[in-house]
């Protein structure tokens, strides 16, 4: 793996900068943690070398003075929004996050449900959490937000929200994903704290967009692709340009909310400590890029991956045409096409020859392998076996799983479990070679290569089952699929790992 990001430097200078910001405020600091506190796989993909739990490591250094508030939007609860990298809904991820934080000794005292307008699903979720002993608060949608500053900064605006009880000087506000309303929760709390005579401050810790990279740098374009469903747009921060004469990149929601922030600080302090949305942030990631070209290329690949995710979601009714169009436009800005993904090209070339579902993998060393569907194996399962054999130095013609073993598995799947697809999935072939490894050295060698698949890139010419998607995800393999449900076989095929 080529590294483009210095994670050790990042941990050092980022934690120092956060501590400096905390010291500038008095009684309490609300810090909005954008992105993900851990499992930040997007950052690790576009900034090779960034560790997914880097933010958590920094927070652990301040855990005695910090508590966490988790935010979830009632809108996301209502539509069962999925966290794509983990395959679980946001409402389930709130509980997962809470458990993860508490297991590390961090204090998590409450959950805030934002954008609440009486949704039955949100009310049911609140009852469920309260039944588990979790304190839950409602924050309502405010008409005209974020532009109607007079209403927002009043008892009819933030004043209608529940006051979130906190006890520590540092309050970290986080969420399962973007668009949950973290900033609004922080601002509401500043208003509520001021009413109670408490001088509270606000800061923002968000990795993307990286403010000191160019507007159309692939790293920043990849952030727009990741948030296409939120209609976020990166832009030059006009306030920063006016105050300092320097160009800085921010995104539209921060720029839109800045007048509200200024008005709130004027009420609390009599002045605003920030001259621009960029000033509110504490992001030091841009100073830790060690190889710009590596990060550019990784980000371009991420944009392509997001494009395929969007078109597959659109085919399943889970995304809008506007989301697809936006990412397509970002690809043009980055001067890339789907042909810039090598596994995609290889899979489609194999499809033209075989006229059946195919898949291709690009390994970390640049090697490309392909596979197609057969009567015994799906293309992803066959591809996985091919990759393991290659990495283990096992000749291609060697069959890791005897046909005599596959046949009874298929019989069970179809005759007894009443499945429609007799072909083995990726998890089933892994279980099979795990069993055989007790008596077969080749299977043992193949299994030992599983960790070496991390970072590989796969493309499938058909949309995969949830089982196969999760298997690739657990192995750390990047996956893209064409928005096709099934390819009819033009010729009958025998079992083959090829």
What annotation goes with each model-predicted range?
Residues 390-422:
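Short HxH-centered metal-ligating active-site micro-motif
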Residues 177-178:
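The conserved Walker
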Residues 185:
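Hydrophobic positions on the alpha1 helix immediately C-terminal to the Walker A/P-loop
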Residues 376-392:
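A short, polar/charged loop-to-alpha-helix boundary motif
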Residues 201, 373-375:
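Residue-level structural signal for beta-strand termini and adjacent loop
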Residues 1-174, 189-351, 355-356, 363-365, ...:
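Flexible phosphate-sensing "switch/lid" loops adjacent to ATP/NTP-binding sites
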């Amino acid at each position: 793996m080529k590294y483009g990001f210095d994670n050790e430097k990042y941990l050092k200078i980022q934690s120092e900068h956060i501590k400096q910001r905390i010291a500038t405020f008095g009684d309490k600091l609300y810090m909005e943690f954008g992105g993900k506190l851990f499992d930040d796989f997007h950052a690790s993909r576009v900034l090779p070398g960034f560790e997914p739990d880097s933010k958590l490591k920094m927070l652990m250094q301040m855990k005695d003075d910090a508590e966490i508030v988790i935010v979830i939007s009632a809108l996301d609860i209502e539509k069962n929004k999925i966290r794509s990298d983990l395959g679980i809904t946001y409402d389930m991820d709130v509980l997962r996050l809470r458990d993860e934080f508490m297991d590390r000794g961090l204090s998590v005292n409450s959950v805030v449900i934002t954008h609440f307008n009486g949704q039955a699903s949100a009310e049911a979720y609140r009852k469920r959490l309260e039944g588990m002993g979790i304190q839950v608060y409602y924050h309502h949608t405010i008409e005209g937000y974020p532009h109607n500053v007079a209403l927002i900064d009043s008892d009819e605006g933030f004043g209608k929200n529940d006051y979130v009880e906190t006890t520590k000087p540092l309050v970290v506000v986080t969420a399962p994903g973007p668009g949950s309303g973290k900033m609004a929760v922080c601002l509401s709390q500043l208003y509520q704290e001021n009413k109670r005579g408490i001088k509270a401050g606000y800061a923002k810790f968000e990795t993307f967009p990286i403010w000191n990279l160019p507007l159309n740098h692939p790293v920043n374009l990849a952030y727009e692709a990741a948030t296409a469903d939120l209609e976020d747009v990166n832009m030059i921060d006009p306030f920063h340009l006016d105050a300092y004469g320097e160009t800085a990149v921010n995104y539209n929601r921060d720029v839109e909310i800045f007048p509200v922030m200024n008005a709130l600080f004027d009420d609390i302090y009599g002045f605003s400590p920030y001259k621009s949305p960029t000033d509110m942030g504490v992001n030091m990631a841009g100073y830790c890029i060690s190889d710009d070209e590596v990060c550019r290329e990784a980000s371009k690949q991420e944009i392509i991956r997001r494009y395929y995710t969007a078109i597959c979601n659109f085919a399943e009714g889970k995304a809008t045409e506007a989301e697809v169009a936006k990412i397509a436009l970002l690809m043009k800005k980055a001067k890339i096409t789907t042909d810039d993904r090598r596994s995609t090209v290889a899979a489609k070339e194999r499809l033209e020859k075989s006229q059946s579902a195919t898949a291709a993998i690009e390994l970390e060393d640049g090697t490309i392998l392909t596979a197609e569907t057969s009567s015994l194996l799906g293309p992803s399962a066959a591809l996985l076996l091919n990759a393991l054999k290659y990495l283990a130095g096992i000749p291609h013609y060697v069959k890791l799983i005897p046909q005599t073993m596959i046949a009874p598995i298929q019989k069970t799947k179809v005759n007894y479990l009443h499945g429609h697809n007799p072909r083995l999935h990726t998890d089933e072939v892994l279980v099979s070679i795990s069993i055989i490894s007790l008596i077969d050295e080749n299977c043992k060698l193949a299994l030992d290569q599983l960790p070496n698949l991390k970072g590989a890139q796969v493309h499938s010419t058909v949309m995969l089952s949830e089982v196969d998607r999760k298997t690739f995800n657990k192995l750390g393999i990047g996956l893209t699929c064409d928005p096709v449900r099934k390819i009819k076989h033009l010729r009958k095929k025998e079992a083959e790992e090829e």
